Amino acid sequence: MSDHSTFADRHIGLDSQAVATMLAVIGVDSLDDLAVKAVPAGILDTLTDTGAAPGLDSLPPAASEAEALAELRALADANTVAVSMIGQGYYDTHTPPVLLRNIIENPAWYTAYTPYQPEISQGRLEALLNFQTLVTDLTGLEIANASMLDEGTAAAEAMTLMHRAARGPVKRVVVDADVFTQTAAVLATRAKPLGIEIVTADLRAGLPDGEFFGVIAQLPGASGRITDWSALVQQAHDRGALVAVGADLLALTLIAPPGEIGADVAFGTTQRFGVPMGFGGPHAGYLAVHAKHARQLPGRLVGVSVDSDGTPAYRLALQTREQHIRRDKATSNICTAQVLLAVLAAMYASYHGAGGLTAIARRVHAHAEAIAGALGDALVHDKYFDTVLARVPGRADEVLARAKANGINLWRVDADHVSVACDEATTDTHVAVVLDAFGVAAAAPAHTDIATRTSEFLTHPAFTQYRTETSMMRYLRALADKDIALDRSMIPLGSCTMKLNAAAEMESITWPEFGRQHPFAPASDTAGLRQLVADLQSWLVLITGYDAVSLQPNAGSQGEYAGLLAIHEYHASRGEPHRDICLIPSSAHGTNAASAALAGMRVVVVDCHDNGDVDLDDLRAKVGEHAERLSALMITYPSTHGVYEHDIAEICAAVHDAGGQVYVDGANLNALVGLARPGKFGGDVSHLNLHKTFCIPHGGGGPGVGPVAVRAHLAPFLPGHPFAPELPKGYPVSSAPYGSASILPITWAYIRMMGAEGLRAASLTAITSANYIARRLDEYYPVLYTGENGMVAHECILDLRGITKLTGITVDDVAKRLADYGFHAPTMSFPVAGTLMVEPTESESLAEVDAFCEAMIGIRAEIDKVGAGEWPVDDNPLRGAPHTAQCLLASDWDHPYTREQAAYPLGTAFRPKVWPAVRRIDGAYGDRNLVCSCPPVEAFA
């Protein structure tokens, strides 16, 4: 790793000399020696005769960047970029180049993490507040969250939200027959394990008999039909039910929004706001509610608060709803959503403004009217926005073939009906080709007055000031400059794996051959993408030791959910549907418990020892107590305590002996690749985080991809899809067959360029850096957990509880002070309150790791001054952190520390820093005074 001749050498931040330096501090002779000391012998893979790890030895040899890009180009060229007029929730759109260059292709945006440290995340928090304002303005509701995974999962969350809000014994929901097919399928998946009964009906005739807690309708419907649902909403409310409407945001620039007709919830996707179809994703879904249901919302919610100087500031609000706190009682298991795509959609709306969006909508509608006018009596619905449904008895296949011959894909509803969807990219030429396919001549457009909206929208300056490219470019730069992303600094967040997202990995995702593919396009159009999917599935099988992989889950949370559903269906297929107990260690991430609850399982907590390991005696006791009903054990490996538990094989065997399945959470797979395979040491199923281990960027909180990998006996129960007969027959968990398919080339490129040796080296280097940090910082902050040989895995936990007890300085103080030193804080208070979990990853250099250590040592010296009484506990640079440039320029400075100590604690030559945009934020104030849309400009005066 000295001459940087391979991609792996450029991905890994340490050269051979730096590795030797770290190993000397750790006290081991080599990387292999470290692996032997850290990883239990019973699971550590022995290298094959070729020198590669088992499984990985079957991967293709590492390719150069040029070779990998050439192979990706060949895969892209195997696709056909047809004009998509399929619709069904996915539409072509024009991504403004200024947004493509300054957001999607900008590491300042795509390498950031979820804004848990809001003082150094104000830029993307503002962008997300813009997104929430966009959604609330267009839907006519008061509160929207900061994105959902896609429209189908947003619908499922809307259903469970209504069930929680209804607070009654009724477990029936009615779904209109004109809801998108894929949405209905995801709803059915979510409903079954929760015991919710779905009644499907044509709701134009009103509600069917019986009691319901909720009603779900679509606007416009899958057939294109626009229905006035106001009478249905009133009827539902009269019968004690809530109403959720899946609404097209572009259509809502013209038609009355759900909130104005009385609906309680709106859900959908923002895909057509500048986000490519991408063979299914990623796209930002949305969910909006009335303010009284705000605490029922799932996922992230950005709110306005104030900092310690009284300045308005943004933060994540109402976090007590979320899985990392409420575990199996959470509103949802969602963590990562689609922040990067939400930012893109928000800026698309800002760039076009209300007038521009309305003009696009009118143009789309005009093209639909032109087609409808020519179809005449063949037209099925007389009110539509963008999608026209035509009756063509026995001719559907002929019409599709004629359009396809001229480069346009239409949608076959059945043998007698074809639908045509217009979008932002539709032209008069496309309309002419469509009419020719139907065999009709152009005629006068069928003018339909659908403009029932009277309320204004997007009047805030965020949507009126940035119409020129110059102003938008500068706005995006100004926002990015407020944040710490990987382009500025190491982000040592434990359990998050903030590694390099290489430019060569990212390059192909903007190619139209990948981006402009409809997820339901003919298979002949997507041969290259399908080969890429097959490659990736086979490589992940080799890496994990499992037998099959589904790439459909579009987040780690959904991978967990899919894996647990597969386990449940497996037990049911064996005549044991009663197996519903899920054992989860007390140290587990809250998502595990939330996912188990969504899968209809009952969580039983297994105790852990003081060293973090699972208490085997308690595990055996719980297994024995629940043997007849035991469904699964969920266990993270390496553990959430940052160590390799040496009893993992025994733990798995105990569960298997009782008829249970073992779910190995793959969140920490970056410490296993090339060293041990969960499918070989006892796991039956794992989800993987491609946005952690395999280089898909975090995007400030999404997109993510959470494939689920299983042993052969669970493979038949992997997610299926109503429009993908090639998939297994399991239940779909995402709207698209292959989830967020357009970002899969990132992981494909990473594996292809790293090869077997590079992948193993990445794991070993990550472990080396973590152990080096543990050794350097242990005398200042005790390392809470180590394995049997005194080693950690790829992350370490620094214990500040004793420091807090002695000095009053908290983990929050240290996290905020790190911003003054130019660093993003590690993970706070997980898995143990009062601690920091540090994960350096393999991509960081020795210089960067040393700088982080020096910052932490400098902070410890400051803490000692507080402990010695030199600085009072309520007025010191830690409690005052972070310090903005504005506060340092104040005429009055009455603190016992200097301005220089506040701003540059290790001197101006230490490292470049991102100045925090605000002082420490008052979280409680923001939750008490909930504001989740753009505040007026006067608030900042």
Curated annotation (Swiss-Prot):
This enzyme catalyses: N(6)-[(R)-lipoyl]-L-lysyl-[glycine-cleavage complex H protein] + glycine + H(+) = N(6)-[(R)-S(8)-aminomethyldihydrolipoyl]-L-lysyl-[glycine-cleavage complex H protein] + CO2
Q: Which family does it belong to?
A: Belongs to the GcvP family.
As recorded in UniProt, its EC number(s) are 1.4.4.2
Protein name per UniProt: Probable glycine dehydrogenase (decarboxylating)
Q: Which PANTHER family match?
A: GLYCINE DEHYDROGENASE (DECARBOXYLATING), MITOCHONDRIAL, GLYCINE DEHYDROGENASE, DECARBOXYLATING
Q: Does the keyword Oxidoreductase apply?
A: yes
Gene Ontology terms, cellular component aspect?
cytosol; glycine cleavage complex; peptidoglycan-based cell wall; plasma membrane
User: In its keyword annotation, does this UniProt entry include Oxidoreductase?
Assistant: yes
- Source domain of life is Bacteria
One Pfam family linked to the record? GDC-P
Alphabetically ordered keywords of this record:
Oxidoreductase, Pyridoxal phosphate
Quaternary context? The glycine cleavage system is composed of four proteins: P, T, L and H.
Q: At which residues is N6-(pyridoxal phosphate)lysine found?
A: 692
Give one GO molecular function term: glycine dehydrogenase (decarboxylating) activity
Signal sequence segment: none
> Please, one GO biological process term?
glycine decarboxylation via glycine cleavage system
Which InterPro entries does the protein's record reference?
A: GcvP, GDC-P_C, GDC-P_N, GDC_P, PyrdxlP-dep_Trfase, PyrdxlP-dep_Trfase_major, PyrdxlP-dep_Trfase_small
Cofactors demanded by this protein: pyridoxal 5'-phosphate
So what does this one do? The glycine cleavage system catalyzes the degradation of glycine. The P protein binds the alpha-amino group of glycine through its pyridoxal phosphate cofactor; CO(2) is released and the remaining methylamine moiety is then transferred to the lipoamide cofactor of the H protein.
The gene for this chain is gcvP
